[in-house]
Structure formats: structure tokens, C-alpha cells
Amino acid sequence: MLSPKRTRFRKQHRGRMNGKSCRGNHICFGRYALQVLEPAWITARQIEAGRRAMTRYARRGGKIWVRIFPDKPVTIRPTETRMGSGKGSPEYWVAVVKPGRILYEMSGVSETVARAAISIAASKMPIRSQFLRLEI
């Protein structure tokens, strides 16, 4: 599971997800990519599930790049706890993604294999996304 080695602060505010992604929205490494169409928090488990699905489908052929990293801690309060007495403890990590962000890139396989592998990974994600091909 992906998570930061260390952070300056244990807990963070939730924040807002306005606008579009201004960085990380172009294909940089591979030939095919999965691009997000909605804003969301994507958990480390979802990122790993998508990566595994793509790797398995491609039968370890080609190369896969994960373009996002979960660096935001999400806190959860214990069940049946009264209000007050501080913020809950960090439970899992999420990556904040805005529309236009590239999640995965892939190369070294045919387009049909890449399209199928990326669609399987897209089904693991909690949001709508689209397949991109690098125009040469």
C-alpha cells in the first residue's frame, strides 16, 4: 500500500476540490493513459487494486506508471464516541484528484491490450474516467 514515509503533520483539513487539474494532465511516460473526469479522493487501496488489475491483464508485459500518490491522511473517530475531545486518528491515505488528472500510463503493449487493461483499472475507481492515446 502506498503511503508517505514521513509527514510534517499527522492530520490535515479536508480541503476543497474546485476547478481542473493544472499539472499531471498530459501523457509523459507511456503511450496510453487513464484520465479522470470528476473530482474525488482516491484511496491507496483503490490505486493498488487498479495497478494490480492492469499488471495481471498485461501478464507482466509492457510497463505501467502510477502518476498519483496518496499523501493526504484521512482521520476517523472511533464508533459510538461523543462529540468533542479532538480529531480522530489517521486511518488511511488518499490522493486528491481533479478532472483531467492522469492516473495510470502504460506502454510496451498493443492498443487493444492497453484499452482492456485500463478499462479494468477504471472499473476499480470510484469515478468516471477515459482512455487516452498519445498522438504522435
UniProtKB/Swiss-Prot annotation:
Q: Which organism is it from?
A: Saccharum officinarum
Q: Which family does it belong to?
A: Belongs to the universal ribosomal protein uL16 family.
Q: Where in the cell is it found?
A: Plastid, Chloroplast
The record's HAMAP family line, in alphabetical order, gives: Ribosomal_uL16
The primary location reported for this protein is: plastid
Protein's name in the database: Large ribosomal subunit protein uL16c
User: What PROSITE patterns does the record tag this protein with?
Assistant: RIBOSOMAL_L16_1, RIBOSOMAL_L16_2
- Subunit organization: Part of the 50S ribosomal subunit.
Listed A to Z, the keywords are:
Chloroplast, Plastid, Ribonucleoprotein, Ribosomal protein
| Any GO BP | mitochondrial translation
- Pfam families recorded: Ribosomal_L16
Asked if the Swiss-Prot or TrEMBL record annotates the protein with the keyword Ribonucleoprotein, the reply is: yes
Q: Which gene encodes it?
A: rpl16
NCBIfam families for this protein: rplP_bact
Which molecular function term from Gene Ontology is one that the record holds? Answer: rRNA binding
The reply to whether Ribosomal protein figures as a keyword in the UniProt entry is: yes
Listed under GO cellular component are:
chloroplast; mitochondrial large ribosomal subunit
Q: What Gene3D superfamilies would the database entry show?
A: Ribosomal protein L10e/L16
